[in-house]
């Protein structure tokens, strides 16, 4: 053998050998092996693994000669395996914390049921009917263990669990996990049904005044012996491990408290019970000490529960004065005593007892309330934020963005409060040097961030600032501030001689120009301009601000005024008036226009008419933004002035097109159809395109109730809009000699551009006029040859069904216009069902099925009091229902499809059955069966689930079909009522899903 080989062999033989893992069946062969194994310092397999192995082997199903799966046999081998599992649990002293952590719910359920069985608890007997006081101690303890585990499992299941990262997919593992998940859910369902009984059992246990005993490995061996070999020791003897009454009550109180606390989320009154149990637990822990064998309670978690209960159920007795800061803060927040919260936070800056995260959560809650419209909380938000910022500074953290935002506009009150918080948060006698340094740096940074020297002086002269900063540091701070922007005056006190320096003319002019920009008082504007013109005659003061804009049709006339002062005054008054009107400051706009009108009346009839026109537009806007929104008709003199404007024939008067638009829209909005159709002068129809359009709209609305043959104006309106949406064609010869066709958008073929038409429509509010326009554009959209899904609209039949020259229409622009119009109309009235249906159809046509369902459901909801009444059949037509069916089908919500098939006038069984056959459904499936009223569909469901072997779902379908109100022999009214009730519930459920 070579030297290398010898070394290798020596190294290999010198390694310690890992003893082989003991197999589960070895414990069957040697009775004493289990105790020896469990006495090892690190037994392999671990005790909990042994429990799993023993119970897994004992519960394995058997296969008979006919290859049929049989339940596990009740033979000696399986009984011994179950006993071994119980003995391992006894070795662990029945510690539920250990067992729950390591065993799954099905395994622990099986283990505790075996404990009940071996403890002679009669199977099938309700624990709540048993008298614990008369039961043998070990039997009573077994019952308590099971019911404690039951409510602990229910509580644990209510907590969110982070899903484990899935490994590589293996079919066998996935099937096993799915089976275990279903089994766990079934057990939890049973435990929740019995939860009330379990709580009663545990409440009864608190009344016991005797010690109990828990099974040990020895008592389990005795129970397993033949009755004649027990040597006189019985189950009621003291052979088990003693559990003192106080220990048992302490553990039960804690578990009951957790159960009550979990129930409090749905019934707040139960929090009182939880509080009582948790505080009793604290008392019992103080009595028995923390070294108890059978009372393992997480005292930190218990303290958290107690604090939460203090907040949720504040005590009314004398202990309320000893509330924790948590409880005090929550009580103050509930009662709106925010000043007390601020005081608690300031005191906490010294004690540092409240976590920073908790303080931040309080600030977030206050911000949320302030954003909801409670403006009084803005000051409170700043004060709480200041307290939190000082806490951050003391602990060496950076200043939050929130504080910087709230301190953007400092004032005396904010700085006073900040200095108060800083002073009360630092104990200068006990504070460390690093803490003092943090506070000093913070105050320096605040000073450097301030521009107003008055505020800088407030901080620099404060006692805390003087104490924390040395003379050299204060001097250095002043030097730093001197190097900043020169616009900041660095003198602590104003220099008296500064006021003796005479201001230059340019400074005075600048100040007056600044006042001129800010002022909206006509008299003050006039005075400023007189002063400015007295100082200099070279400037044109209408150019001072580039924000002063006057329409180009007016500016030529105004700038032609020879007198400079008058020209500036007229221009500025008009510009400011137009700006005020734009920002809806109508009162100032009226003052400015009135002053301008008075001024120009003296020398210019042309400008006088201009101002009258602008004041008319202002009065229209004022009415529309004020009483017009409440539906109050405008005064008759305003209507007369609008008519006068439309009929005006003064030559050389500059006119703004927007005034004509607003006047025509005003007449349409207030249903002045008689005037527009019969009284408008003929020359207006030829010269003003908006009057022409308004006349056609008014006439179409007026003729709408009449027969189709008489609707000539509808055809005229159609032709006008088609012409507007048409494109002009040009021919171009390319380099290769070929002639190509070019479409030029926004052509001049129509009476106005499409963009102008859209702008005009967005000034309308009258529902019928908007419906007519929307209907026209929908029809124009549907005329396309390549359209797949038509959009529906009211009055669509009044329009022509074809266009002679389809190629000339810009259908892309039409589609965009339809979407714009629907968006606008719904902003005017979001509860108009016909407009909602159009919006839904648009989404349907563009394959946005979830959004389409949202609007179909909203259309039904607005006309049925959220489905509490029947949806009118003219809203949910067969076409709408079929589109809803298609949406659900394409969203893979196949059960919803089947239910909607019932809404059709003739139930579509073929589609319903086909959808129910789909197994990959993304909806609630069998939870929807209660909404089916058609017995044929329910019968098909029963057959389908029976065929698939889906017993639970089949039972749900049978339960639904067995309801007496669906009996075919019932009167028609009863059947209709049953159907209507299910329709209502289903549509409300759908609305909650898609809204």
From Swiss-Prot:
Subcellular localization: Nucleus; Chromosome
Record key words, sorted: Chromosome, Disease variant, Intellectual disability, Nucleus, Phosphoprotein, Repeat, TPR repeat
TPR repeat segments: 250-288, 320-356, 570-603, 833-866
Gene Ontology process terms (BP): protein localization to chromatin; regulation of transcription elongation by RNA polymerase II; RNA polymerase II transcription initiation surveillance; snRNA 3'-end processing; snRNA processing
Motif (WFEF motif): 24-29
Chief location of this protein within or outside the cell: nucleus
InterPro entries named in the record: Int8, TPR-like_helical_dom_sf
A GO CC term attached to the entry: nucleus
Residues bearing PTM Phosphothreonine: 18
Disease linkage: Neurodevelopmental disorder with cerebellar hypoplasia and spasticity: An autosomal recessive neurodevelopmental disorder characterized by global developmental delay, profound intellectual disability, seizures, absent speech, spasticity, facial and limb dysmorphism, and subtle structural brain abnormalities including cerebellar hypoplasia.
UniProt comment concerning the protein's domains: The WFEF motif is required for the recruitment of protein phosphatase 2A (PP2A) to transcription pause-release checkpoint.
General function of this protein: Component of the integrator complex, a multiprotein complex that terminates RNA polymerase II (Pol II) transcription in the promoter-proximal region of genes.
Assembly mode: Component of the Integrator complex, composed of core subunits INTS1, INTS2, INTS3, INTS4, INTS5, INTS6, INTS7, INTS8, INTS9/RC74, INTS10, INTS11/CPSF3L, INTS12, INTS13, INTS14 and INTS15. The core complex associates with protein phosphatase 2A subunits PPP2CA and PPP2R1A, to form the Integrator-PP2A (INTAC) complex.
Family label: Belongs to the Integrator subunit 8 family.
Record protein name field: Integrator complex subunit 8
Gene that this sequence comes from: INTS8
């Amino acid at each position: 053998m070579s030297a290398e080989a010898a070394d290798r062999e020596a190294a290999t033989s010198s390694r310690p050998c890992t003893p082989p893992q003991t197999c589960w069946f070895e414990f069957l062969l040697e009775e004493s092996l289990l105790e020896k194994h469990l006495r090892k310092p690190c037994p392999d397999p671990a005790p909990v693994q042994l429990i799993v192995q023993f119970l897994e082997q004992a519960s394995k199903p058997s296969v008979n000669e006919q290859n049929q799966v049989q339940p596990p046999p009740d033979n000696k081998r399986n009984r011994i395996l179950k006993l071994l599992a119980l003995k391992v649990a006894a070795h662990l002293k029945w510690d539920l914390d250990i067992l729950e952590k390591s065993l799954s719910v099905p395994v622990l359920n099986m283990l505790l049921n075996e404990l009940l069985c071996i403890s002679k608890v009669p199977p099938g007997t309700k624990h709540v009917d048993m008298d614990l006081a008369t039961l043998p101690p070990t039997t009573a303890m077994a019952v308590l263990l099971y019911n404690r585990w039951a409510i602990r499992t229910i509580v644990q299941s209510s907590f969110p669990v982070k899903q484990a990262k899935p490994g590589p997919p293996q079919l066998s593992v996935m099937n096993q996990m799915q089976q275990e998940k279903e089994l766990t859910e079934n057990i939890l369902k049973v435990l929740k049904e019995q939860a009330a009984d379990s709580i009663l059992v545990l409440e009864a246990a608190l009344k016991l005044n005797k010690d109990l005993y828990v099974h040990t490995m020895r008592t389990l061996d005795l129970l397993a012996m033949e009755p004649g070999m027990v040597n006189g020791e019985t189950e009621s003897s003291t052979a088990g491990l003693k559990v003192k009454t106080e220990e048992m009550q302490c553990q039960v109180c804690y578990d009951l408290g957790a159960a009550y606390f979990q129930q409090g989320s749905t019934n707040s009154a139960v929090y009182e019970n939880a509080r009582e149990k948790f505080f009793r637990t604290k008392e019992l822990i103080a009595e028995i000490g923390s070294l108890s064998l059978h009372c393992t309670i997480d005292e930190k978690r218990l303290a958290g529960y107690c604090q939460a209960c203090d907040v949720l159920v504040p005590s009314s007795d004398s202990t309320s004065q000893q509330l924790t800061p948590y409880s005090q803060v929550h009580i103050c927040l509930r009662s709106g005593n925010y000043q007390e919260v601020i005081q608690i936070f300031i005191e906490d800056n010294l004690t540092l007892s409240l976590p920073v995260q908790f303080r931040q959560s309080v600030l977030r809650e206050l911000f949320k309330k302030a954003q909801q419209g409670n403006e009084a909380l803005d000051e409170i938000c700043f004060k709480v934020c200041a307290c939190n910022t000082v806490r951050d500074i003391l602990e060496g953290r950076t200043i939050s963005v929130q504080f910087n935002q709230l301190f953007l506009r400092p004032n005396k009150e904010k700085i006073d409060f900040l200095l108060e918080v800083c002073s009360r948060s630092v104990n200068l006698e006990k504070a460390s040097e690093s803490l003092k340094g943090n506070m000093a740096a913070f105050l320096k940074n605040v000073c450097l961030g301030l521009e107003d020297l008055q505020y800088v002086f407030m901080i620099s002269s404060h006692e805390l600032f003087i104490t924390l900063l040395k003379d050299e540091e204060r001097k250095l701070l002043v030097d730093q501030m001197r190097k900043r922007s020169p616009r900041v005056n660095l003198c602590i006190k104003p220099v008296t001689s500064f006021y003796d320096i005479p201001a230059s003319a340019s400074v005075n002019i600048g100040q007056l120009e600044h006042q001129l920009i800010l002022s909206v008082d006509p008299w003050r504007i006039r005075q400023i301009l007189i002063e400015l013109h007295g100082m200099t005659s070279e400037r044109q003061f209408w150019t001072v601000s580039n924000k002063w804009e006057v329409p180009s049709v007016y500016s030529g006339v105004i700038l032609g005024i020879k007198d400079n002062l008058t020209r500036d005054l007229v221009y500025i008054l008009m510009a400011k008036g137009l700006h005020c009107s734009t920002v809806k400051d109508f009162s100032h706009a009226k003052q400015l226009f009135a002053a301008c009108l008075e001024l120009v009346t003296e020398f210019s009839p042309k400008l006088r008419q201009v101002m009258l026109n602008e004041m008319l537009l202002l009065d229209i806007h004022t009415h529309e933004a004020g009483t017009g929104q409440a539906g109050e008709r405008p005064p008759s003199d305003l209507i007369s002035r609008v008519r006068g404007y439309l009929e005006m024939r003064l030559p050389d008067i500059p006119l703004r097109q927007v005034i004509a638009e607003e006047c025509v829209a005003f007449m349409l909005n207030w249903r002045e159809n008689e005037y527009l159709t019969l009284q408008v002068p003929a020359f207006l129809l030829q010269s003003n395109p908006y009057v022409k359009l308004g006349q056609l709209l008014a006439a179409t609305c007026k003729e709408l109730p009449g027969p189709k043959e008489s609707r000539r104006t509808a055809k005229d309106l159609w032709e006008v809009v088609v012409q507007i949406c048409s494109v002009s064609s040009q021919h171009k010869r390319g380099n290769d000699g070929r002639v190509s066709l070019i479409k030029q958008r926004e052509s001049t073929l129509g009476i106005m551009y499409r963009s102008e038409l859209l702008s005009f429509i967005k000034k309308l509010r009258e529902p019928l006029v908007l419906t007519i326009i929307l209907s026209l554009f929908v029809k124009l959209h549907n005329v396309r040859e390549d359209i797949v899904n038509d959009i529906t609209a009211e009055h669509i039949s009044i329009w022509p069904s074809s266009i002679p020259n389809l190629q000339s229409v810009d259908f892309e622009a039409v589609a965009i216009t339809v979407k714009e119009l629907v968006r606008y109309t719904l902003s005017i009235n979001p509860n108009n069902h016909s407009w909602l249906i159009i919006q839904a159809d648009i989404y349907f046509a563009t394959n946005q099925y979830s959004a389409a369902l949202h609007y179909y459901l909203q259309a039904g909801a607005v006309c049925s009091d959220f489905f509490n009444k029947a949806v009118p059949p003219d809203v949910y037509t067969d076409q709408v229902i079929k589109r809803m069916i298609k949406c659900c089908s394409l969203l893979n919500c196949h059960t919803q499809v089947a239910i909607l098939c019932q809404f059709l006038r003739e139930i579509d069984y073929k589609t319903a059955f086909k959808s129910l056959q789909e197994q990959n459904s993304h909806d609630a499936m069998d939870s929807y069966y209660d909404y089916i009223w058609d017995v044929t569909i329910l019968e098909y469901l029963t057959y389908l689930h029976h065929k698939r072997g889906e017993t639970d779902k089949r039972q749900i379908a049978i339960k639904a079909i067995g309801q007496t109100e669906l009996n075919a022999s019932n009167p028609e009214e009863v059947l209709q009522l049953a159907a209507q009730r299910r329709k209502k519930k289903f549509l409300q459920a759908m609305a909650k899903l898609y809204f």
